[in-house]
Amino acid sequence: MPLTRDFKETIQQRARRDGRFREALLKEAVDALLAGDLDTGKIVLRDYINATVGFEKLGSATKRSPKSLMRMLGPRGNPQARNFFEIVAYLQKKEGVRLKVRAV
């Protein structure tokens, strides 16, 4: 289900001013992907990118076109693990966090 523009704007505004919220968004995206929920993970990751670095800057950092990154994380996108982890590594560095995977 697509999010309404007002909701996306609310997410972006909060992410711009709240570092813990940004960290939680990034963690939520990775958690969803690791749990096998690719669709939710991609949606949350796109929202995170749009609210923080943007696809232009991410494209420059990863040497990929912003449109390619948007397609990769779009509804029909299927990112390769190498691309996904390169994106996550850059976002962690940019955010100043280090996510860890733990068995529960």
Model-identified regions with their sequence ranges:
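Short basic helix-loop element that most often maps to the first helix and adjoining turn
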Residues: K42-L58
